[in-house]
Amino acid sequence: MIQRNIRTPIMHRAVEANGFVYIGGTIADDTSVSMGEQTRNILGKIAGYLKEAGTDATKVVAASIFVTDLSQKKEMDAVWTEFFGDNLPARATVGVADLGGGALIEVVVTAIKG
């Protein structure tokens, strides 16, 4: 069974299928702030999506991160490691030219349900 949650005009923020929760690309609400603050906001939003799906950040198994400025990666990494602690997921970080709307970072995660 597939369950789609939190519909937007172009996607569902979270999709549950076969014991996994897939969280689509998430950007910060305020894109005028630093990479670290955008990361903190995104991870807070993702935590909420995971909770709504009946899981949490300790169950995140993979992440794809897109950033517009790899020179700011250390700032993102500091917030990332603080958020996940000892439960760091597998991860890829990719530099991109533009994310639109002033976003510096976009995050996609996959978690285990439950």
Where are these regions (language model features)?
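Short, polar/acidic, helix-capping and beta-turn segments at strand->helix junctions
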Residues: 1-114
